[in-house]
Curated annotation (Swiss-Prot):
Entry function: Involved in ammonium transport.
Keywords for this protein: Ammonia transport, Cell membrane, Membrane, Transmembrane, Transmembrane helix, Transport
Tissues expressing the protein: Expressed in roots and leaf blades and sheaths.
Taxonomic source organism: Oryza sativa subsp. japonica (Rice)
SUPFAM superfamilies for the chain: Ammonium transporter (SSF111352)
InterPro entries recorded: Ammonium/urea_transptr, Ammonium_transpt, Ammonium_transpt_CS, NH4_transpt_AmtB-like_dom, RhesusRHD
Chain ranges passing through the membrane: 29-49, 57-77, 127-147, 161-181, 190-210, 225-245, 252-272, 285-305, 309-329, 343-363, 399-419
Entry's Gene Ontology molecular function annotations: ammonium channel activity
Protein's name according to its UniProt entry: Ammonium transporter 2 member 1
Top-level taxonomic group: Eukaryota
Region: Disordered, residue numbers: 454-473
């Protein structure tokens, strides 16, 4: 444990510029965003899919989270937030050395160019950790589009390449002082960098990987709705760090952002549920979680920049526009019907993220901008920004969409030359047991290799002996736990 000297102002661990409150909040916000991915989305993915894909889906999220960290500290962070190499990209470099990590951080967007340099009251290590959590969750969200059929080895190759070649470009352009930031495109906490990127890249990946089996597309019911709600709840609560950490300080802007985040999420959930009741005569728990998600995504581009009444307005749109694209437009579009986006990431993240960016361009107030932005004159169209700000929001979105579409395609086509992107149909029929040799629950009947009818087992009554030869054969075949023949 640390010695009492950690509390001494005369020691290097407590430099004059360190604000313990800001540092503590930023580390807390980092942890909250981390909890969104692991266990939040790990639990959500493992429960919202069919039982035979629970392990594979959870592992894809877990692997993306872990692999992102090493790539991030080796080269990714400085490509996204380091010195400028190109107007949309930073210079690669490690973020592993003491000399780099213990010094005072610099807000990435003010590190170069004509914008005054701003230094928060904590070390660079805190900033590296905070921004890692955003990079990781973007890949975890992207995974939702290709669950239930992507070759896990192809996914393992895809995650580092996409992080380096796609995510870092959006992050530098909008947050690292790149050309979109200097132009005045508003993205408070990741509506474009994270959600629009993951939605477009996920949809593109789903196209190239190919669809699930027909039987899985037709019937893909969640294996545990209660766990799905728990995972969604972790995601919602973690969003306090997601948007509350964006000002890089424990200040007024953080308070406004956290309140607006919760207001928009609740409004969107209620709006989505009402539409389900009106059109389908009953509320859907899955729909409620989707409505919660679209509300959280929609408020993200402007969480600390809009008034709370505007967060209600954004929640109404967040619960209705993605609902319409998913429930109505999707069924009328040949392209949307063809591409098998497993968890509808395109609708819940790309559509909601773009919607949030446009609404922020309308509703952002100059007074709230002045609390945290170093770019002068930014304001929504309703506050004097005019159509010009909407044009900037649409232009920024167009760049993010085009870059993710092209780069994701190139990465997957390159990987496909060496590793099949999709599992063979034989493995898709089986699921987790074929992909990992493991199952979420010890229940026979949904995707396992073992066929009880081929092994002379009693199906109940008094003739079966679990401790006899049948039980021994089950053990030899690798069955784990109590089995139920379905």
């Amino acid at each position: 444990m640390a010695a009492a000297g950690a509390y001494s102002a005369s020691l290097p661990a407590v430099p004059d510029w360190l604000n313990k409150g800001d540092n503590a909040w930023q580390l807390t916000a980092s942890t909250l965003v981390g909890i969104q991915s692991m266990p939040g989305l790990v639990v959500l993915y493992g429960s919202i899919v069919k039982k035979k894909w629970a392990v594979n889906s959870a592992f894809m999220a877990l692997y993306a989270y872990a692999s992102s960290l090493l790539v991030w500290v080796l080269v990714g962070f400085r490509m996204a937030f380091g010195d400028q190499l190109l107007p949309f990209w930073g210079k690669a470099g490690v973020a592993l050395t003491q000399s780099y990590l213990v010094g005072r951080a610099t807000l990435p967007a003010t590190a170069h160019g004509a914008i005054p340099r701003t230094e928060p009251f904590y070390p660079e290590a805190t900033l590296v950790l905070f921004q890692f959590e955003f990079a990781a969750i973007t890949l975890v969200l992207l995974a939702g589009s290709v669950l239930g059929r992507m070759n896990i080895k192809a996914w393992m190759a895809f995650t580092p390449l996409w992080l380096l070649l796609s995510y870092t470009v959006g992050a530098f352009s909008l947050w690292g002082g790149g050309f979109l930031y200097r132009w005045g495109v508003i993205d408070y906490s990741g509506g474009y960098v994270i959600h629009l990127s993951s939605g477009i890249a996920g949809f593109t990946a789903a196209y190239w990987v190919g669809p699930r089996l027909k039987s899985d597309r037709e019937r893909f019911s969640p294996n545990n709705i209660l766990l799905m709600i728990a995972g969604g709840g972790l995601l919602w609560m973690g969003w306090a760090g997601f948007n509350g950490g964006a000002p890089y300080a424990a200040n007024i802007a953080a308070s406004v952002a956290v309140l607006n985040t919760n207001v928009c999420a609740a409004t969107s959930l209620l709006m989505w549920t009402c539409l389900d009741v009106i059109f389908f005569r009953k509320p859907s728990v899955i729909g409620a979680v989707q409505g919660m998600m679209t509300g959280l995504v929609c408020i993200t581009p402007g969480a600390g920049l809009v008034q709370t009444w505007a967060a209600v307005v954004m929640g109404i749109f967040a619960g209705s526009v993605p609902w319409f694209t998913m429930m109505i437009l999707h069924k009328k579009s040949a392209l949307l019907m063809k591409v098998d986006d497993t968890l509808a990431v395109f609708h819940t993240h790309a559509v909601a993220g773009l919607l949030g960016g446009i609404l922020t361009g309308l509703l952002a107030t100059p007074e709230l901008f002045s609390l945290e932005s170093t770019v002068p004159g930014l304001r929504g169209a309703f506050y004097g920004g005019g159509i010009k700000q909407i044009g900037k929001q649409l232009g920024g979105a167009a760049f993010v969409i085009a870059w993710n579409l092209v780069v994701t395609t190139a990465i997957l086509l390159g990987i496909g030359l060496f590793i099949p992107l999709r599992m063979p149909d034989e493995q898709l029929m089986i699921g987790d047991d074929a992909a990992h040799g493991e199952e979420a629950y010890a229940l026979w009947g949904d995707g396992e290799k073992f066929d009880a009818t081929r092994h002379d087992l009693s199906r109940g009554g008094g003739g079966g002996d679990r401790d006899g030869p049948a039980g021994e054969r089950l053990s030899a075949l690798g069955a784990r736990g109590v089995t139920i023949q379905l």
